């Protein structure tokens, strides 16, 4: 993973959502993504559509990581989109 040193990294200008994963399913994924999109719009750092971030992309990440129970964290700043997971 490569992180660009932007205002999100240096000063916290960004938004994130931590989404519970239970039995391989993301809990309230649509609500989390709507809230994240509103935050990005408020911060004037784009939208999920402009970044190409979709429900499918998040679901695919969780499947690729073989995450069945835990959390998926999506962090977005002006220059970065970071997916993380924990069991």
Task: Locate the predicted segments by residue.
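Conserved alpha/beta cores of soluble small-molecule-handling proteins
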Residues: 1-87
